[in-house]
Amino acid sequence: MNEINDNLNKKINEFLQKLDNVYLSIDIDSLDGEKYVGTGYPEKDGFDLDQLKRFIKNIMKSGKVIRSDLVEINPSLDKNNLTVNAGSEILKVILGNRNV
């Protein structure tokens, strides 16, 4: 799995080098829908939260992100606030306040 993550981060970095600015849009249903069900379209075999956070950190380190959003969280469909809490963790990474 680490090799896959490293290869994806490498491709992300190559792509980022071609851009001046980035609008980062994170759809919560990119997470594994078997665990994170608080979305209208849960997807099986999505990212795990730590994996997605590593990708976001990598993108944020580029300094090219000028706007970002996080979409598709539906608390009424969530179980034990797992999806809502995942969204909070993602926003902390985007904002750079990991201890908030």
Regions found by a protein language model. Give the residues of each.
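Catalytic cores of soluble, metal-dependent hydrolases
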Residues: 1-100
